[in-house]
């Protein structure tokens, strides 16, 4: 399941991020790419050793932790390996698939990838995120503060930025439920039961759906 979520960041959070990143040091993005992805990665990213990195990470993780739609759709166990990436004119990231595990010796699984956009789509040309699927390609270029989440198993790329600067946060989520089809099934169930609760309160139908949801999560969750 591919999902876009609007207004993940408040305007205040977005401004704080942009202000901090404008003064922070960036380094070659190849340092965090897998051995094969290094061949096609041409970006710079926020230096993890800088004072700004922890501040930026805290802002983003706070925003993600409070987003109910993200929690329902992804069932996060751990949000990890955040990268603050900048694409200047001429930069791109060729077709690749994300590593199955990240975090060095921690071995955190990457079930879901996300891109959180920090710059307006009108402020740069090119730089589209392209997700390569069996049925064709899907192209995304979202508003600042919005994000896209998608299974980490997909090939994807970022087209060349031909003018301006593309600034994004990318990261990965280890889900309580690793199978994407099972996550989508649970998301649909959760959406329906919440809709019923809004209309009818704690009805018999709501209780039955909640029982089914809880038992499937118990069965599929890890």
UniProtKB/Swiss-Prot annotation:
GO terms for molecular function: 2-oxoglutarate-dependent dioxygenase activity; iron ion binding; L-ascorbic acid binding. Gene3D superfamilies: q2cbj1_9rhob like domain, Rabenosyn, Rab binding domain. Fe cation binds at residues 96, 98, 156. Signal peptide: none annotated. GO terms for biological process: DNA damage response; intracellular iron ion homeostasis. Binds 1 Fe(2+) ion per subunit. Keywords: Dioxygenase, Iron, Metal-binding, Oxidoreductase, Vitamin C. 2-oxoglutarate binds at residue 166. Its EC number is 1.14.11.-. Its cofactor is Fe(2+); L-ascorbate. Residues 78-175 form the Fe2OG dioxygenase domain. The keyword Protein biosynthesis does not apply. InterPro entries: Oxoglu/Fe-dep_dioxygenase_dom, PKHD_C, PKHD_hydroxylase, Pro_4_hyd_alph, Pro_4_hyd_alph_FE2OG_OXY, RmlC_Cupin_sf. HAMAP family: Hydroxyl_YbiX. NCBIfam families: PRK05467.1-3, PRK05467.1-4. This is PKHD-type hydroxylase PCC8801_2196.
